[in-house]
Every structure is written in C-alpha cells, then in structure tokens.
Amino acid sequence: MKKKSSRLNLISIIMAAVSLLAVVLRSFYVYYTPSWMRQHDVIGFGAGDGQAAFIEYFHQGHLLIDFDPREKWGFFQPPLHHMLSALWIRLQEVLGFAYEAACENVQILTLIYSFITLYFSYLIFRHFRLEKTAMVTAFAISAVHPGFILMAGSINNDMLAVMFSVMTIYYALKWNEDPRWSYTIALALTIGLGMMAKLSAALVAPAVALIFVVKWIHAGTDGFVDHMKKFVVFSVICAPLGLWSPLRNMIRFGVPVGFTPEVGEPVSAPLWQRIFDIRTAKPFVCLEKYGDPYNEFNIFLGMIKTSLFGDQDFAIAMEEAGHGGLGAGMMTAFGWILFISASLLAILCFIATVRVLCSGRFIAKRSERAFMAAIYGISVAVYIRFMLVSGSYSSMDFRYVLYLIPVEALMAGIWMKGRNDRLIPAMGILTLAFTVSATAVYLMLSMAG
C-alpha cells in the first residue's frame, strides 16, 4: 500500500513538473518573440495588411467590414479573434498602456488560449481514465509539443480555433455520456465560436452530428422528441455564430464560402515523391529562400517539421543573430533529436490510433469510438487532400489540424493502459527525449529573438 502511494505521489510530482514546464516554455517564448516574428498571415501592426491590420481595423471603431475582404490580405477570415484582440488593446489603453505595448500584448490572449487548450486536453485524458505512465505520456506530449509553443505566440486566429476544437471534443464526449442541456449549449457555443474564429473549426462538427444521430437512433419516442428539442436549440445557437460572417461576405461581396487565397511556395514534385520520398538533409523545413535546392514537398516530412519548427530554419536564425558555429550546431543537434523522437512518436501514435479505434477492447462505448474515429479520420482526410490538391508548401502546415495532437496523445495513452511489455519503456524514453529536446530548442531560440 505504501509503495502504491509513493508511486502515485511520484506521478503527481511529474504531472506538476510537466505543467510548470508547459507554462514556462510557452510564456518565455511569448516573452522573447515579437508580435511580427514567426507569424502566419499577420505581417505586422501598422502595415495596413494582414491579420494585424484586421485587428487594427476593429480597434479603430469599425463594426463590420464595409468592403470586399479580398482587397486586403487576411481580412477574409472570420473576425472573432480580431474583435477580441481589438477590445483587449482598447482595455490596455484605458489602463494606461501605450498603443505599441498593447499591440505586443495581444500575445497574452493567444498564450491564454494555449493554456485553456492544455487544460481541456487533460480533461479529455481524465474522461478516458488515463492514469500513471499513460497519463504522464499523453499529457507530456500535449504540454511540450512545439506546435502549441509556436501558436502561443502567434497572434493570428489559429490558436483560438484550436482551443474551441479541443473544447468541442471534450463537451461532445460529456454530452454522449449525459445529454443534458448545459452540454448541448456548450457544444453549440464551442462549434459556433470556433467557426467564428476560423471556418476550419467546422471539421469537428460532422463527428458531433454522428453522436447526435446515434442518440436519436437509440432513443425511444419520448427520448427522440427531447433530443430533437436539443438539436433545434443547438442549431439556433451554433449556425448563426458560425456562419454569419462567411454568408455576409458571400451575399454582400460575392466571396465564396470557405474562400482561401492562393499562397505559398510552389511544390512541383510528382505525387510519388510527395508521399514516399522521405529523404531530408536537415531537421528544419527545406525552402529555397533558405538556400535549399527545393521547397519541402513530402507531406509527411512537411507535417512533422511544421509542427515542430513552423516554417523556420532555427539554425539559420541562430547564425543571423550572431550565434553561428557552436550555437547553430547545438540547435541543429537538438533539432535532429526533436525531429527523430517526434517522428517515432508519431508512428507509434498512429499505430495506437488504428489499434484503439478498430478494437472494442480499448474503448468500450461504440459511440465514443465512432466519434473519435470520425474526428481523426475526417480531419486527416481533409488535411491530406488539402496538401495534395493545393500544390504549395504552405498547405502542409500542421497548425491547421493542431487539435489532433491531444487526440493522438490520447490514443497512445489508451493503448498503454494496462500493458507491461516493452512498449511502456519505449514510449517513456521517446517522450523524455521529445520533452528534453523541445525544451532545449525553444530555450536556445531565445538567443535568436
């Protein structure tokens, strides 16, 4: 009994340490990263274009766009994040902050979004009763994953959309367990507000619709009527929140729903290379602008590298900051450890996902298994199709489906539950290598600014 208690205390200490590490890494990254650096579609405050300009548009007192949003870069996005950011800037000004400082502090919002995402990831792990090593592994992968570190400092709308997507997964699981009104309204709000942040948040909606249908099928006459009432209320809340912006742009300015401008470095490699050619000379993304002979073209290398380093070459960043030689060499060395450990973890997590979702031995409730399979299958299918159809490097950026990180971590944790074979130490070693190398990379990156 005493030995079991000591082990539980050790697990609690490790969980607390990982939580603290997540807070430190994300907060420190925001501290040393300016609001214009390592961003996506932001450009910068005062530039007149990009998502920073979209924030400024609302800060200037405008309520809604009164021109074709395609005329300014980044203005085609749904406006929730930009409205919240404008209000946050205004509040800081009331409190005495200078405008420039208030703009920099928009990163505080995205940092908070990343913390909320981690908290709801933990709740999802708790829902599936992960514990001990399985919980530590799943939580550590989600807590220190560089994708969330990067998004914590990114002032575009991605982190808010990811936050609502993870919240949707949690509330859908709770609704499936107990379809009470509070969970129904929470689901409507998280999907609707997620789409108001970024339309791609709708990728989780079909899986939610699936569990709604399953409930209707298994409900009696009285239960069917009750579920129908909830669905009507859900639709009345969710649809206007999620669709008013794209529908308004379509009706007023002729902007197609789901409009995305052509952007990004072109990829000219044939299909077989994009799928099977996984040779790489460095852990960071290969781009012609960094002096590489080609733009990253393999979809699997693209998704791993962008999830870890964004579209940056951190070794070059170290050199440009005057830390070439040893500094760039150490960054590359830890970059390789991070890349290799992340790749091996991704393979094991994929195997775990297939095993868990294809067998009732791991998740007893068929509806939960179907829901998680729909979340994963639809998201991956849309993401891969987007990469292959787009023909540009930018389409491979993993930030579009970053909410799949806790999903994959969950699958690994479920797979690990109750096992005592070689999988446990293997996952432990890989997770430790992943954690240490991610920490080293993002601490060293502070030297490059």
Annotate each PLM feature.
Residues 28-39, 44-76, 80, 88-93, ...:
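Extracytosolic helix-loop segments that constitute the early lumenal/periplasmic catalytic or substrate-binding loops
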Residues 229-345:
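Membrane-lumen/periplasm interface segments of specific transmembrane helices
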Residues 97-101, 121-144, 163:
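Transmembrane-helix signature of polytopic, membrane-embedded enzymes
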Residues 147-160:
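Short acidic/glycine- and proline-prone juxtamembrane loop motifs at membrane-interface regions
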Residues 104-129, 167:
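Transmembrane-helix motifs of polytopic, lipid-linked glycan transferases
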Residues 127-129, 168-183, 194, 216-218:
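Membrane-interface transmembrane helices that cradle and orient dolichyl/undecaprenyl
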Residues 171-174, 204-236:
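Perimembrane helix-loop-helix junctions
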Residues 9-48, 235-251, 380, 433-440:
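Transmembrane signal-anchor helices characteristic of membrane glycosylation enzymes that use polyprenol
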